[in-house]
């Protein structure tokens, strides 16, 4: 069956591991907060430090005026065999044993200053102190800064609320046992500790009341109403404590002797003699130790459940952010190629419609290209005035006889050249969409988020490939336009009705305007014929340009976006492969933290399993 020593020792061990990992409570549920603890709460000058020293049987806590305890002190007491030497160990100095308890006090002060500086600031980072002695019981106590009502010189005005918030963060946890220290020579209703305990534990199920300074109460008064639970009832009995006087402290009266003196006080007291067996620091320590053991037994199932849940959550997060990468070049190359394929899958999903974005390419063909073609200045180029000018220039000094073929060709060539602008604009628009899809695909590839260097390399390689595809596509679409100029569709003109238009008779029987081969009507007819031919070419290019762009850019992007990159990676040495897999420092730090926390939880589970519970 699990003994008190093994149970409390188990919790102590897990607490120390939590502190090493920086788990000392805070927002949300943590293993630290799931562990049963005893928090010592009291106002300044309530005798809180003296109670702790009485329980330990040693002078070891810093003393002075104002706020002395400025960091939580996790005090783990380990009972040893009679006759063994007492010593103390700090978690931050694990290889150093302190046999001189004056040195323990000095180390507490120094370790406090290491975090808070020489100021009177406070910190919620705990100090872990273990004391091994035959004069203690197995017990863990957390000494918290004393509650205060005013700030002293050198402290911010917020110190009063800061201390209360820190103390409250401990005592409001359902697994915290509250040891509320109240001086008996003051009205219990004004006790800072009792007031706070009442707020966080209104039923008193988690609160142990301790009345100090019973020996210096005014004559004719006593603390029986409190100790017997009449003035303020708790679920657990009140315990009276008689601490050493200042004179005893100055004389360095031995703590063991002070314990005997305390017990004699209760046994010989007319007021408290009938309560003597349930008074004093020794009884308080045993009472707390027994209760802590009971609470630990009750809480172990929920602690195990929390540990198992935390292990599952940590493993899930490690899987999400990725496990550490192997250091050999083969594994690194395999990892890089797998990450490239993951990016490639996301990119293709965008193009194929599995993700949004690919539809923008169709928008270029269906809206942007037709709109650009409609805006071409054919009306100006094929105006009667310009047609006449071009035809006349083509004829030169010898006018055409029947049809101005050279004029036609010049007008057609000039018109077709306008298509180069929309063709190149279509190539550039699709290139822009593809680049944007590369950017989106990089950001949406979860596996790449831990490798910013590789993500940048892939993006650069993909964009370089897209530029090559764009250049080839631009050459192709310009060839398509040039092909329309290089060989005209003669059949189109043969089918045209080339007879001059019949005009209504001139009322004055004047000759018809089109009788003159150089009349406006004649040039309008030429412009109309060229316009009809250009419309046919426009329809052809409206269909062929998208085909060329898709073939040269979209199709190649799907087929071979990273082919050149694959070849480059395959030739890299181990060091360069490793550099490509450099991770985000914050991610590496997070993985390290998770790995340590996972180790903590697994070790805690093993430690709990190792305890015999039957």
From Swiss-Prot:
Subcellular compartments: Cytoplasm; Cytoplasm, Cytoskeleton; Cytoplasm, Cell cortex; Cytoplasmic vesicle, Clathrin-coated vesicle
Entry's Gene Ontology BP terms: cell division; mitochondrial fission; mitochondrion organization; pollen maturation
Catalytic activity field: GTP + H2O = GDP + phosphate + H(+)
Gene3D superfamilies in alphabetical order: Dynamin, middle domain, P-loop containing nucleotide triphosphate hydrolases
Keyword Lyase: no
EC class: hydrolase
UniProt keyword terms in alphabetical order: Cell cycle, Cell division, Cytoplasm, Cytoplasmic vesicle, Cytoskeleton, GTP-binding, Hydrolase, Microtubule, Motor protein, Nucleotide-binding
Region (G2 motif): 68-70
Entry comment describing in which tissues the protein is expressed: Ubiquitous.
GO cellular component: cell cortex; cell plate; clathrin-coated vesicle; cytoplasm; extracellular region; microtubule; phragmoplast; plasma membrane
Region (G4 motif): 212-215
Chain residue ranges for the region called Disordered: 499-519
InterPro entries reported in the protein's UniProt record: Dynamin, Dynamin_GTPase, Dynamin_GTPase_CS, Dynamin_N, Dynamin_stalk, G_DYNAMIN_dom, GED, GED_dom
Domain Dynamin-type G stretches: 32-301
Residues given in the record as GTP binding sites: 45-50, 213-218, 243-246
Protein's name in the database: Phragmoplastin DRP1C
Organism per entry: Arabidopsis thaliana
């Amino acid at each position: 069956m699990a003994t008190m020593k093994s149970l409390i020792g188990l919790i102590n061990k897990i607490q120390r591991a939590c502190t090493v990992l920086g788990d000392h409570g805070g927002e949300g549920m943590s293993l630290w907060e799931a562990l049963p603890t005893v928090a010592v709460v009291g106002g300044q000058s309530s005798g809180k430090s003296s109670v702790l020293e009485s329980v330990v049987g040693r002078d070891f806590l810093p003393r002075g005026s104002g706020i002395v305890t400025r960091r939580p002190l996790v005090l783990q007491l380990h009972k040893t065999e009679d006759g063994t030497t007492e010593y103390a160990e700090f978690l931050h100095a694990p290889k150093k044993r302190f046999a001189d308890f004056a040195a323990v006090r000095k180390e507490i002060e120094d370790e406090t200053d290491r975090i808070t500086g020489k100021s009177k600031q406070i910190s919620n980072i705990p100090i872990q102190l273990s004391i091994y002695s035959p004069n203690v019981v197995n017990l863990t106590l957390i000494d918290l800064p004393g509650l205060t009502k005013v700030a002293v010189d050198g402290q911010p005005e917020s110190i009063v609320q800061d201390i209360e918030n820190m103390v409250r963060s401990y005592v409001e946890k359902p697994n915290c046992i509250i040891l509320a220290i109240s001086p008996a020579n003051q009205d219990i209703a004004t006790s800072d500790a009792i007031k706070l305990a009442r707020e966080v534990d209104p039923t008193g199920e988690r609160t142990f009341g301790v009345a100090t300074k019973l020996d210096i109460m005014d004559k004719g008064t006593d603390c029986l109403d409190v100790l017997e639970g009449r003035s303020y009832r708790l679920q657990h009995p009140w315990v009276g404590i008689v601490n050493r006087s200042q004179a005893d402290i100055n004389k360095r009266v031995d703590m063991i002797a002070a314990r005997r003196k305390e017990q004699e006080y209760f046994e010989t007291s007319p007021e408290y003699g009938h309560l003597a067996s349930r008074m004093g620091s020794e009884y308080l320590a045993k009472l707390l130790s027994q209760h802590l053991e009971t609470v630990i037994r009750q809480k172990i199932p929920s602690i195990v459940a929390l540990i198992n849940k935390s292990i599952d959550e940590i493993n899930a997060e490690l899987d999400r952010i990725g496990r550490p990468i192997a250091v050999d070049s083969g594994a690194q190359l395999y990892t890089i190629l797998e990450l490239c394929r993951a990016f490639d899958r996301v990119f293709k999903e965008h193009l194929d419609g599995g993700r949004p974005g690919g539809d923008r390419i169709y928008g270029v063909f269906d809206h942007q290209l037709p709109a650009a073609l409609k805006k071409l200045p054919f009306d100006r180029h094929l105006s009667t005035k310009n047609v006449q000018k071009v035809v006349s220039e083509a004829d030169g000094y010898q006018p055409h006889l029947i049809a101005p073929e050279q004029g036609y060709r010049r007008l057609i060539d000039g018109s077709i050249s306008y298509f180069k602008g929309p063709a190149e604009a279509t190539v550039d628009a699709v290139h822009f969409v593809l680049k944007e899809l590369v950017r989106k695909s990089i950001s949406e590839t979860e596996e790449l988020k831990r490798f910013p260097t590789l993500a940048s390399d892939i993006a650069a390689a993909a964009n370089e490939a897209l530029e090559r595809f764009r250049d080839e596509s631009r050459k192709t679409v310009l060839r398509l336009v040039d092909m329309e100029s290089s060989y005209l569709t003669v059949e189109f003109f043969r089918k045209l009705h080339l007879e001059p238009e019949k005009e209504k008779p001139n009322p004055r029987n004047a000759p018809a305007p089109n009788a003159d081969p150089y009349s406006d009507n004649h040039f309008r007819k030429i412009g109309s014929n060229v316009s009809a031919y250009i419309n046919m070419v426009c329809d052809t290019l409206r269909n062929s340009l998208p085909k060329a762009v898709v073939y040269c850019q979209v199709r190649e992007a799907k087929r071979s976006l990273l082919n050149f990159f694959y070849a480059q990676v395959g030739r890299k040495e181990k060091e360069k492969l490793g550099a490509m897999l450099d991770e985000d420092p914050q991610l590496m730090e997070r993985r390290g933290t998770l790995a340590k926390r996972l180790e903590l939880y697994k070790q805690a589970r093993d430690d709990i399993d190792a305890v015999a519970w039957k």
